[in-house]
Design a protein with these regions (language model features):
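N-terminal secretory signal peptides that target proteins for export/translocation
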Residues: 1-12
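Extracytoplasmic metal-acquisition and chelation regions
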Residues: 2, 32-314
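N-terminal regions of proteins, emphasizing targeting and processing segments when present
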Residues: 7-8, 23, 31
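Bacterial N-terminal signal peptides
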Residues: 13-28
Length: 314
């Protein structure tokens, strides 16, 4: 009987220990779940389409949409009542800041928001000073506008070296998990793109719209001239003549134009010249907001540049 009693006590102790361990494990799981809540069902509205691609690619569990549609230009965007409804319905809004998107400032009052303009710093300004100064020789009026645009470049999604900085800021602002899978994929793409573009770093080209300044800086490309910083504003005749002379001089391989801007100026620039005219889309209008969207978008930009750099002129 003594042996049976001792065995019973031993088994009870083991059972109590197992119950205690199970309870502690359940508590730990509950605490961890509260610390890292599921992203399922959380909606994030992003002001511009290509930035929405980035956010969705980094955090696929989020419900991500864009305010300015893929085929619109943010340069002349006007809020509609339906846009106001979408803003109110979102759990958070990611935008470029009041300087670049003044039409959103009032609409976002009281709304949980992430202002990406704060990711711009003095290093960006110093890096951009050089080219802004060069454009002074082309057109005094254009220079003043371009200088401002370079110091405060709103095309944050077109800065390959700034992508991880943006993601880090969004992550901390919205208490999101680190997007490790996307960052690994992006680092691999960035390395491959640099290898592809290095042999062409001396090939000159002209851009209609100065959206790719940071891209040019990152890959050390040779952007010889830019037609305009803001396609919604008129370009001086003197500057048009100067850019056309550059296109005719043999210094450049191609002229980049954008599908959002069907400008008669483009025709004036290249008519009668043997120069490649290549479409490049900084607004990612052909890409869906999904997990693979941003890398596909960047790969398409890379494809436009390699199309310019390879083969004879038309």
């Amino acid at each position: 009987m003594l042996i049976i009693h001792s065995l019973r006590q031993y088994l009870l102790k083991r059972l109590n220990g197992l119950i205690l361990f199970t309870c502690l494990a359940m508590v730990a799981t509950s605490v961890n779940a509260k610390a890292t809540p599921s992203l399922e069902g959380q909606s994030v509205l992003v002001s511009v389409h290509p930035m929405a691609l980035l956010i969705k690619s980094a955090w696929p569990e989020l419900e991500v949409s864009s305010l300015v549609s893929a085929n619109q230009s943010p340069h002349d965007f006007v809020l509609k009542p339906s846009d106001m409804s979408n803003i109110a319905a979102a759990d958070a809004v990611i935008w470029m800041g009041e300087t670049f998107e003044p039409y959103l400032a009032k609409a976002l009052r009281g709304q949980r928001q992430v202002d990406l303009s704060v990711t711009l710093d003095e290093a960006d300004a110093h890096a951009n000073d050089g080219q802004a100064g060069d454009e002074h020789e082309n057109d005094e009026h254009a220079d003043h506008h371009d200088h401002d645009a370079h110091i405060h470049d709103p095309h944050l999604w077109l800065d390959p070296n700034g992508i991880k900085k943006i993601l880090s800021f969004v992550q901390s602002s919205l208490a999101l998990p680190a997007p490790k899978a996307f960052i690994a994929q992006y680092d691999a793409w960035l390395s491959s793109a640099a290898t592809t573009l290095i042999p062409h770093k001396d090939v000159g080209f002209v851009s209609f719209h100065d959206a790719f300044h940071a891209w040019v800086e990152t890959f050390k490309l040779n952007q010889v001239a830019v037609v305009t910083s803001n396609p919604e504003k008129p370009v001086g005749t003197r500057h048009i003549v100067e850019v056309r002379n550059i296109l005719a001089s043999g210094q450049v391989q191609c002229l980049f134009v954008e599908p959002q801007f069907q400008s008669r100026i483009v025709t004036k620039l290249h008519k009668g010249l043997s120069i490649k005219v290549i479409k490049i889309d900084p607004m990612a209008s052909k890409f869906l907001i999904d997990e693979a969207g941003f890398i596909k978008f960047y790969q398409s930009l890379l494809g436009s540049f390699t199309q310019c750099f390879s083969g004879p002129q038309d």
